[in-house]
């Protein structure tokens, strides 16, 4: 019984995570990515791979200019800052 409860909880958590990523990708949410080298870059969230090891972004603002599309390794990321607008009826 406890094993089924753990699986159910894991399923619910995974579905929440997927819905979160889906909402961010569909809204093209502007993000600030904080990197290990104490840099921060701004971009628009595009997608994340299933192992959550690569972050796809667009309009990546760097010291060298704006890169239309890029992939950031999540191992290089310290944190990501974003604002989500709550839709009516959401908790």
Swiss-Prot record:
Checking InterPro entries in the record gives: Sm (IPR047575), SMN_gemin7 (IPR020338)
According to its UniProt entry, the protein's GO biological process terms are: spliceosomal snRNP assembly
User: What does the record say about the knockout?
Assistant: Inviable cell population.
GO terms for MF: RNA binding
Occurrences of domain Sm (ranges): 18-86
Q: Mind listing the UniProt keywords for this protein, alphabetically? A: mRNA processing, mRNA splicing
A Pfam family hit: Gemin7
Which parts form a coiled-coil structure per UniProt? none
Q: Which GO terms describe its cellular component?
A: nucleus; Sm-like protein family complex; SMN complex
- Cross-referenced PANTHER family, in alphabetical order? GEM-ASSOCIATED PROTEIN 7 (PTHR14679:SF1)
Q: How does it assemble?
A: Part of the core SMN complex at least composed of smn1, yip11/gem2, gem6, gem7 and gem8. Interacts with gem6; the interaction is direct. Interacts with gem8; the interaction is direct.
Assigned protein family: Belongs to the gemin-7 family.
Q: What is this protein called?
A: Gem-associated protein 7 homolog
From which organism does this entry originate? Schizosaccharomyces pombe (strain 972 / ATCC 24843)
Q: Which gene encodes it?
A: gem7
